[in-house]
């Protein structure tokens, strides 16, 4: 099963080249930014917590492993789970925030298949086509 990472989805910055909102230079945005204001963040698929951490760019983040896929959820105000915790599609994994290198509160998602980054829009389209 698969679901969206938020109750409602509004893309504020898509995957691809863009003008960086902090330094103004053109750069690759390796994820997708979603509008989120202190909202619960949900696991998109069944899997387990691979890593929980903090860094200056991503802020508080959690990485979930779903077989050959990983999904990183970044800039969280809170992470609710520890590494190795099993998750199911729809499990609350944290709360959105603006930690790290962010211009405001949002959810940044990075998706990988076998370690290769791909456009999260592909998963979002899959969710949309499989909703009941």
Show which residues each predicted segment covers.
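Surface-exposed, glycine-biased beta-strand/turn segments
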Residues: 1-60, 89
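Residue-level detector of conserved, well-ordered beta-strand and adjacent loop positions
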Residues: 12, 35, 65, 74-77, ...
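Residue-level recognition of beta-strand microenvironments
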Residues: 14, 52-53, 79, 96-99
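A short local loop/turn or secondary-structure capping micro-motif enriched for an aromatic residue
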Residues: 20-21, 51, 59-60, 72, ...
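Structural recognition of the beta-strand scaffold that forms the well-ordered cores
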Residues: 33-35, 41-43, 63, 72-74, ...
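Short histidine-centered loop motifs in beta-beta connectors
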Residues: 42, 52, 66-90, 114
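Conserved, short, structured surface segments that act as functional micro-motifs
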Residues: 60-66, 85-132
